[in-house]
Structure formats: C-alpha cells, structure tokens
Regions:
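Inter-helical turn/loop segments and adjacent helix faces that build the functional surface
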Residues: 187-195
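Hydrophobic cores of alpha-helical transmembrane segments in multi-pass integral membrane proteins
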Residues: 33-144, 159-185, 200-276, 285-308, ...
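Cytosolic juxtamembrane amphipathic/interface segments immediately preceding
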Residues: 16-32
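Short, Lys/Arg-rich, polar N-terminal cytosolic tail immediately upstream
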Residues: 1-21
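Conserved small/polar residues in nucleotide/adenosyl-binding loops
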Residues: 507-513, 532
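Membrane-interface helix termini and inter-helical loops of multi-pass transporters
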Residues: 310, 380-383
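Hydrophobic alpha-helical segments, chiefly the membrane-spanning helices
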Residues: 517-542
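Solvent-exposed interhelical
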Residues: 281-283
Length: 542
C-alpha cells in the first residue's frame, strides 16, 4: 500500500492542470506525445486533401480544374507537409509517448525541451498553413532548388514562409533527437543494459543520431538562402559568384538520410509488432541492431544519388551508384529477420499484421525500383518523371504509413485505455492496399512513357489519359480507406469499453509485454529478465 500511495502522489504531482491552461503548459511526456500525434494526423489530412486535388487535375487531359500557379503550390505543400510535418513528427510523438514506458522511467530527460520542440513544430507548421490558406504558399517544389527559389525568380514572400517555417520544424526535430538520445543512454531502468533494451528504443536511438547529423545542413542551407533573398548575398546565384549546386548538396545531405530517418522508426514498429503477432521472440536481435546502425552510416554516403544528371564527374557517379546499391544489404537483413520471425512463430492476421503484410509487398517493390534508379543510365532516363514520384511513394508510404497504421492498431488500446474495437479495419486495409497500388503502379507506367512530374496538364495525343484516370480513381479509393481508419479510431475512442492499458489487448496472446508497469521510482521495483530482454515488475512476468 505504501508503494501504491507513493505512486498516486507522484501521479498527482506530475498530472497536468485541467483545461486549456494545462494543455498549453503541459510537460508530461504522455500529453506531449498525444499532441504531436494528433497534430501530425491533422497535417496528414491536409496533405491528403492536396494530393486529391493534384490527382483530380491530372485525371483527364487538358484539365482546367486548377490553374498552373495553384497546382505548383499544391504539389509543393503536399511534399512539404508529408515529409516535414507528418512523417518525422509522427515518429517524435510515438517515441515521446512510448520511450519512458519502455525504458522504465517516469518521463524523458528534459520535459521542457520536449514542450519547446512541440511548440516550435506547431509554429512552423502554422506558418506554412497560413501561407497556403492565403494563396501565398511556396511553389518551388518541396526541395526548393535555387535559382528557381532565388530573389530573381521568386520575388514574393512565398519561399520565405517555407524557409522560416521549415527551420522551426527542423529545430523541433533536433530537440526531440537530443531528448531521445540522452534519455536512452542515461535514463534506462536499473539493470537495463543497451543489449536488453526493447528493439524500438534502439531504432529511436539510431534515428536520433541521424537527425543530429543530417538536419543541421538543411538549417544552414535555409538560413543561407533566406539571407540571400533578404540581403542580396550571392550564396547560390551563379552570375554573382555563387553556386546553385551548393543548395543541392546541403539539401540532399539532409534529404537522403531523411528517407531512412523516416523508415527506421517504422522498422522499429515492425520489429515490435511481429513477435507479438507471431507469438515468438524476435529473430536476430543483434543483427537487426547492427543492420540499423549500418543503414544509418551508409545513408550519409548517398546524397549524390539525387544529382546524377547535374554533370558530376564519372568517378563520383560510380561511387555513389555503388553505395546506393549497397544500402539494400542492411535493409535486406532486417526484412529477412522479420520473415524468419514469422516463419518461426504462428502469425495471426489481426489488424496490425495485415498492415505489416501490406508493408512487405509495397516496400519490396519500392526497394527494387530503388535499385533501378541507383543505376546511372536508367536514372538519366527516369529522372524527373512520374516514375521517380511513384518510387518515392512506394518507399515512403510503404515503408512508413503501413507500419504506422500497424502501430496505431497495436498501441491504441494502450493510449486510450479501452479494449480493442475496430469494426472497419479489414475493409479499410483492403481499400488502402488496392488503391495505393492502383495509384502508383500506374504512375510508374506513365513515367516510363515520358510524363514529367510536376506538370499541371498534358495533351490528349500523349496517350497518358487512361493511365492517369486509373491512377486518380485509385487514389480516391485509397483516400476512402484512410478516412475509414480515422472513423475506426473515433469509434474505438467513443464506443469501446474501458479496459486495462495493455499495448495490444489481444488477450489470448501471452507473450510478455515490453512495458515496465512500475508503481514507484525505487530501483528495487524493476527487474530485468536477461532471457527475454523484457522488464518485469517484481516477481510477476507481466
């Protein structure tokens, strides 16, 4: 009883104030994690609406649904929102919520830094939304290449909104990375060595180190471009002694590791969910950790992969082409470990497992097309076509959204404190899976036929009309499926009965959970089971 009383007193001390004041001033990791996730979901909805507008415009030849200027703003904001305001913040929110529970600590190392990071993210995102709603959104593409975005060709304030807003978002990500790194290295439960951590914590640590290394170049580039636009200093203007390729180097030093920064947290979700769904232990824990570290290291040697058509020397082309192919090896190690885990166990097709199977199909196709574009002659032909857009979506949607949907269905009972109730999940998954592949397989096809990305219309004589119509209809099917997931979450939140905060709430699955359900902060209340790498409470196996 004394321990339970201490637990209740600590809960009262750490609880946020009721009402809006508590919401805006909270430094509790659970509150901030939910705030990150809800905000990221809101931006995902905005980005999805923009995607539907883009596909509506491209559904038929010579369409006048939107004009060229609005179309440029839509595709720029769609890419910006999905890459900067949805993908990375979703990882941040998930890690902020879960890591203390996984590590056996009451909160992260610097709670106020977590709150500061959230409000930086919210402010940067709000700047971009304001620009969109007032018709002054950036229109230079989500990677904002100079000289197109320089003061000569973009004299308005559209680009400035992007540069300032994204800088705040990047600062937010760095705050989260510092938080995760310190918490994982210094705030683990007594007895939890690094080799006994939950696998998701390893992925969070590797991703955080990548953020700390990869995001400063983009912040530097954004500051330099804004200074050039505001004060006329010629960092990227070739006619004044600058170098426009400098921006590409700075951006892709961030941008290509960003792909793996997005993928690795999703891989952490998969490595967590598969053993539970298969009712066995994770195969190759050490190999998976090593492959994640190798993937992080190799990702910083690939940035010129996006610059094969810029006239760089042939020796550089050969090196980066080989490195781009080599990165498939550590990725393959993880995929084989996941397949081996399922083979060793007895997987059951609950909702998380369905989305993981969708991930396997989609991500493998994306990986194969990635090897294709790593070959320089093919990249010269496919560069800046719809093929590249489709490949990117296969890697990022397949490598991130499907695993995150699995994570939502897996952890939602833990977050909500309600028993599992998902009435639309199977139908939603079918619509998402079929709609996604219909959209982007068609986009691969039309890209190989020569359709450039970012064009707002095309002539009927090109023969692209039927393929684009199939792609657009499929995208709306996918959107309906994603909307049904949202409805499923709402139904769960309002209809499902209260229950224990169990991570999956599949009561017939008896594998121990990875969460140390502690009732005090004393060291003796937590024990580490060296055989299962799981935290145990007292003598119960939880």
């Amino acid at each position: 009883m004394n321990a339970l009383r201490r637990h209740r007193k600590l809960d009262a001390i750490w609880a946020s104030e009721p009402g809006w004041k508590g919401w805006t001033s909270s430094v509790n990791h659970s509150d901030l994690g939910r705030m990150f996730l809800v905000t990221a979901l809101f931006f995902f909805l905005v980005g999805g609406v923009l995607a539907m507008l883009i596909r509506a415009q491209l559904a038929t030849p010579d369409s006048a649904f939107v004009d060229a200027g609005a179309f440029a703003q839509f595709f720029t904001m769609h890419g910006t929102i999905m890459m900067f305001l949805f993908a990375i913040p979703t990882f941040e929110g998930l890690a902020i919520y879960l890591l203390p529970k996984m590590l056996g600590t009451r909160d992260l190392a610097f709670p106020r830094l977590t709150a500061y990071g959230y409000w930086c993210y919210a402010f940067g995102g709000a700047m971009l939304l304001v620009a969109l709603f007032f018709g002054i959104a950036p229109d230079g593409g989500w990677f904002m290449y100079p000289p197109l975005t320089g003061p000569l060709h973009s004299p308005g304030i559209n680009t400035d909104f992007w540069l300032i807003g994204i800088t705040f978002v990047e600062i937010s990500a760095i705050c989260a990375a510092v938080e995760f790194t310190v918490s994982i290295l210094k705030y683990r439960a007594p007895g939890m060595s690094l080799d006994k951590m939950p696998i998701f914590a390893w992925y969070a640590l590797v991703t955080s180190l990548m953020i700390l290394t990869g995001f400063p170049p983009l912040i530097l580039g954004s500051v330099l471009l804004e200074v050039e636009r505001a004060f006329g200093l010629p960092f990227f203007q070739a006619d004044l002694g600058g170098d426009s390729l400098l921006w590409q180097h700075l951006f892709w030093l961030f941008g290509h590791p960003e792909v793996y920064i997005i993928f690795l947290p999703a891989a952490g979700v998969i490595s967590t969910v598969i053993p539970v769904m298969a009712r066995t232990t994770l195969l190759g824990y050490g190999w998976i950790v090593a492959s994640a570290l190798a993937l992080a290291f190799l990702s910083f040697g690939l940035w010129v992969h996006h610059m094969f058509t810029t006239g760089i020397p042939h020796m550089g082309l050969a090196f980066f082409s080989a490195a781009s192919t080599l990165v498939a090896v550590p990725t393959g190690v993880q995929v084989f470990a996941w397949i081996g885990t399922m083979w060793k166990g007895r997987p059951e097709l609950h909702m998380p497992m369905l989305h993981i199977l969708g991930f396997f199909v989609t991500f493998i196709i994306g990986g194969l097309t990635g090897v294709m574009v790593a070959v320089v002659p093919f990249d010269w032909q496919a560069h800046d076509t719809a093929f590249i857009t489709a490949h990117l979506h296969y890697v990022l949607f397949g490598g991130f959204v499907f695993p995150m949907l699995a994570g939502i269905y897996y952890w939602l009972p833990l977050v909500s404190g309600r028993k599992r109730l998902f009435r639309l999940g199977e139908l939603a998954f079918a619509l998402i899976f079929v709609g996604f592949h219909g959209t982007f397989l068609a986009m691969h096809w039309v890209g190989l036929l020569g359709q450039r990305r970012r064009i707002e219309t095309y002539d009927a004589e090109t023969g692209w009309g039927v393929i684009n119509f199939i792609s657009s209809v499929s995208s709306f099917v996918m959107a309906i499926g994603l909307a049904m997931v949202l409805v499923d979450i709402v139904i769960h939140g309002f209809v499902a009965v209260r229950g224990p905060r169990h991570p999956v709430s599949y009561t017939h699955l008896t594998l121990p959970t990875i969460y140390p359900v502690y009732i005090s902060v004393s060291a003796e209340s937590l024990q580490i089971n060296p055989d299962t790498h799981h935290v145990r409470q007292g003598t119960s196996s939880n």
